[in-house]
């Protein structure tokens, strides 16, 4: 028996209003799926290149040379492993044999990026990490955070970082 009061109650249930199961609105389900998609893409923005048959000092020198050969000036070199050792939070076990971050910027690229969108100033300076892990100090890793390719400036930044890392890896393997 279908009463008028029951019909009104059924119409007020969100699964009836929005046509989705379990009372979840379509908006909520779309929002949840977009959140999951954006979270997984955040984890994939680090690019790592491994270099074998070299040593940290040679790879460091190769990275400096690769940056300077692009006509760029290094802003700073951050001794990341040393900073972690000094602050020794937790059990004190460090994952790095050696680790540093080299920061640099291209004035032309920075100008292009901020013309595209003022908030893109957060992409400067660019940085490349150079490190070894405790369990394998003979393998040097070069890593950077990809700026993505959503604008022409970001594409140029990505291309610049790729060129620098590839050139640094080549120089490190040469042990020049």
Regions found by a protein language model. Name each.
Residues 38-40:
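N-terminal signal peptide c-region/cleavage motif recognized by signal peptidases
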Residues 1-24:
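N-terminal secretory signal peptides that target proteins for export/translocation
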Residues 42-71, 76-78, 170, 174:
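Terminal, regulation- and interaction-focused segments at domain boundaries
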Residues 43, 78, 95-96, 133-136:
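Short, ordered beta-strand-loop transition motifs
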Residues 105-156:
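Surface-exposed, polar helix/loop patches in the mature regions of secreted/periplasmic/lumenal proteins
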Residues 142-176:
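C-terminal partner/receptor-binding element of secreted or periplasmic proteins
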Residues 79-123:
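Compact, glycine-rich, soluble single-domain proteins
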Residues 29-35:
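Sec-dependent N-terminal signal peptides
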């Amino acid at each position: 028996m279908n009463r008028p009061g029951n019909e009104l109650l059924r119409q007020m249930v969100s699964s009836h209003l929005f046509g989705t199961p379990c009372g979840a609105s379509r908006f909520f389900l779309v929002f949840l799926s977009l959140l999951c998609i954006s979270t997984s893409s955040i984890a994939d923005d680090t690019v790592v290149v491994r270099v074998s048959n070299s040593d940290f000092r040679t790879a460091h020198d190769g990275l400096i040379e690769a940056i300077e050969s692009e006509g760029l000036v290094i802003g700073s070199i951050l001794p990341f492993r040393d900073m972690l050792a000094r602050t020794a939070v937790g059990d004190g076990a460090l994952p790095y044999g050696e680790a540093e971050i080299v920061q640099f910027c291209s004035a032309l690229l920075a100008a292009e990026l901020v013309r595209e969108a003022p908030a893109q100033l957060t992409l400067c300076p660019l940085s490349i990490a150079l490190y070894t892990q405790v369990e394998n100090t003979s393998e040097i890793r070069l890593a950077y955070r990809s700026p993505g390719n959503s604008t022409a400036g970001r594409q140029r930044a990505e291309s610049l970082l790729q060129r620098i890392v590839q050139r640094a890896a080549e120089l490190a393997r040469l042990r020049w």
